[in-house]
A protein has these predicted regions:
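PAPS-dependent sulfotransferase catalytic core
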Residues: 1-67
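PAPS-dependent sulfotransferases, especially Golgi type II membrane carbohydrate sulfotransferases
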Residues: 2-4, 169-241
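Hydrophobic/aromatic beta-strand patches that form the interior of the parallel beta-sheet core
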Residues: 4, 28-30, 69-71, 94-97, ...
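Generic structural signal for helix capping and beta-alpha/helix-loop junctions
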Residues: 37-39, 105, 178
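Short, surface-exposed amphipathic charged segments that create phosphate/polyanion-binding patches used
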Residues: 43-48, 159, 183-190
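Glycine-rich phosphate-binding loop used to anchor ATP phosphates in small-molecule kinases
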Residues: 60-83
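PAPS-dependent sulfotransferase catalytic domain
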Residues: 75-171
Length: 241
């Protein structure tokens, strides 16, 4: 059955996207399992224990008991390295890339961590994975801008579902607030998703007051060319009326 992978840089609204996929009820939804295997250790999924990313990726394309899978991952060097080495997974999965303006990523990260250790990750690494998917010769990768997702959730999710051949379920655009077992190990990163009941844009664009911070500006300068390149491929989402 199909494997639907969503890749994003940190702080790009990907957990809200994941929460919507859980709400559908028709997918085996996996929250950052590759990252967990790299940084925490063996992982149990569906009654099976996986020791490595390679084991998990092989299972995803070979045997998921006939169910469709949704996999959400934040792209960092270890995760990207394990995926680009698996050309079968690159070619057979349906890949989507959720992008966000680099200055917004940086401000959101810095507000939590007070550092920019993701300086060499971000949209640059996401772009590298996008190119690897293109070169694998499988399904064309999909790009969604998170700004479109919060500006017009119904249209954005309908366009995504059409692109990856999933039925659109309007009821999955809203959910009950609360923490979720899938992201319990990293819950402090997901407070916005946990307190939300749907896709909502922040009331103030610079809610952290960091738009002019030099670290934010440096990150934005580094990653904006890669964000803009990915923007060339993003789904055309109409503005909400």
């Amino acid at each position: 059955m199909p494997v639907h992978a969503l890749w994003s840089a940190p702080r790009s609204r990907s957990t809200a996207f994941f929460r919507s996929m859980v709400e559908r009820g028709d997918l085996l939804a996996l929250h950052e399992p590759l990252e967990g295997l790299h940084f925490i250790g063996p992982l149990q999924i569906d009654g099976q224990t996986f020791e490595s990313p390679q084991e998990l990726l092989a299972w995803l394309v070979e045997d998921t008991s006939g169910r469709s899978v949704f996999l959400k991952e934040t792209v960092n060097p270890p995760v990207q390295g394990s995926v680009v080495d698996d050309r079968r997974f690159l070619a057979e999965a349906r890949h989507a890339f959720l992008i966000r303006r680099p200055e917004e990523i940086a401000a959101s990260w810095f507000a939590l961590e007070h550092d920019m250790r993701i300086f060499d990750t971000g949209p640059r690494l996401l772009h590298d994975l996008f190119v690897a998917v293109q070169n694998a010769g499988g399904h064309p990768p999909i790009v969604i801008d998170s700004q479109d997702l919060v500006a017009n959730p119904a249209a954005a999710m309908a366009a995504y579902c059409a692109a990856v051949e999933l039925p659109f379920i309007a009821d999955a655009l809203n959910w009950q607030p609360g923490q979720h077992s899938e992201w319990a190990r990293s819950s402090r990163w997901h407070e916005d998703a946990a307190t939300s009941s749907g896709f909502v844009a922040p009331a103030r664009p610079d809610r952290h007051g960091l738009a002019t911070h030099p670290e934010v500006a440096r990150f934005s300068e580094r990653h904006t060319p890669f964000y803009e390149e990915l923007c060339r491929y993003r789904l055309d989402i109409p503005s909400a009326t």
